């Protein structure tokens, strides 16, 4: 009985690790980039901004915070970050974060600060915000986890990518290939 339980735990841990690291990805376009409502995102342009991606993220997501450290190291990219909280606490924090900024630059500053400092909080000012719509959009298009990255060419990766894998994916060679 004890060996069976240990085996079951090991199988479950392996499955969780696979989900957390590889998740799902597509190296063939299938997502229609034009379906994205870019005005509902927080935009950042780094370098020449030639490579364009959308990232569905949430301030309470541990893998999203880890992914932000990876995104810091990527150059020549335009990143559209869509706040897509998956639980009520993250929903409130996402709305507070969105409403605390009066423009894209302030929202970007607050988001990056929140990703590096879990204690960062923002005033609970109410405002019109796209957060609920981002969640509905995610459900409609089967974006069920954060972070999820979509390339302008329609390729999609759900889950965290280390820097080398992200760079490989951005170059069109596939996230997990040689």
Task: Describe the predicted segments one by one.
Residues 5-88, 123-145, 165-178:
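Extracytoplasmic thiol/disulfide redox context detector
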